[in-house]
Amino acid sequence: MALLGTRGKSKAAARGRRHTRLRKKIVGTELRPRLVVTRSARHVFVQVVDDAQGRTLASASTMEADLRGFDGDKTAKARKVGELVAERAKSAGVEAVVFDRGGSQYAGRVAAVAEGAREGGLNL
C-alpha cells in the first residue's frame, strides 16, 4: 500500500495518515470482509474485499451505467451505491462486513454509502 503524503500538512496528507492508522486496525476476513469506500470529487467506488485471499467479492460505483441515469445529488447516488453493493455482496454470500472509510471522514457521501449498505441488509 502506498503511503499518501504522510509528512505534509495538506488534506491529502492528513487523509493518508488516517488511512494508514485505520488499516492497522481493520482487516477483512473470509467471514467478515472489508467494505472499502473510495471517494473522488465526482464519484464513489465501493468494494467488498477479502484480505485473506486478496480478492474482491463485490463492487459498485457511481460510474456504472444503471446509476448514471439516476437523478439526485452525489449523496443520494452514494446511498444507491451502498444498496447496490449490499445486494451484490449478499448474492456472493456475505452477510457482515467491516467498514473501511479509507481515511475519509465518516460524513456526507461516505456515511451515505454505509447507510445504504445497512438498508440493503449488510451488517456493518
Swiss-Prot record:
GO terms for cellular component: cytosolic large ribosomal subunit. Signal peptide: none annotated. InterPro entries: Ribosomal_uL18_bac-type, Ribosomal_uL18_bac/euk. Keywords: Ribonucleoprotein, Ribosomal protein, RNA-binding, rRNA-binding. GO terms for molecular function: 5S rRNA binding; structural constituent of ribosome. It comes from the Bacteria. The keyword Ubl conjugation does not apply. One of its GO terms (biological process) is translation. Transmembrane segments: none annotated. Pfam families: Ribosomal_L18p. This is one of the proteins that bind and probably mediate the attachment of the 5S RNA into the large ribosomal subunit, where it forms part of the central protuberance. Part of the 50S ribosomal subunit; part of the 5S rRNA/L5/L18/L25 subcomplex. Contacts the 5S and 23S rRNAs. NCBIfam families: L18_bact. Belongs to the universal ribosomal protein uL18 family. PANTHER family: 39S RIBOSOMAL PROTEIN L18, MITOCHONDRIAL, LARGE RIBOSOMAL SUBUNIT PROTEIN UL18M. This is Large ribosomal subunit protein uL18. It comes from Leifsonia xyli subsp. xyli (strain CTCB07). The gene is rplR.
